[in-house]
Amino acid sequence: MAVPKKRTSISKKLIRKNFWKKRGYWTALKAFSLAQSIFTGNSKSFFCNK
């Protein structure tokens, strides 16, 4: 017999959502930092021809 699952609380839902938002923020920050270092020519980990 099928039993309905318990409802996920709002606080737990927000915690999970914020985790994903924070992860996206740090990834974007890292990408922006890499782009800045490439643009200024200070990159040591990324090689590109100018």
Curated annotation (Swiss-Prot):
It is found in: Plastid, Chloroplast. The lineage of its organism: Eukaryota, Viridiplantae, Streptophyta, Embryophyta, Tracheophyta. Belongs to the bacterial ribosomal protein bL32 family. It comes from the Eukaryota. GO terms for cellular component: chloroplast; large ribosomal subunit. The gene is rpl32. It comes from Lotus japonicus. This is Large ribosomal subunit protein bL32c. Keywords: Chloroplast, Plastid, Ribonucleoprotein, Ribosomal protein. GO terms for biological process: translation. Its main location: plastid. PANTHER family: 50S RIBOSOMAL PROTEIN L32, CHLOROPLASTIC (PTHR36083), LARGE RIBOSOMAL SUBUNIT PROTEIN BL32C (PTHR36083:SF1). GO terms for molecular function: structural constituent of ribosome. Disulfide bonds: none annotated.
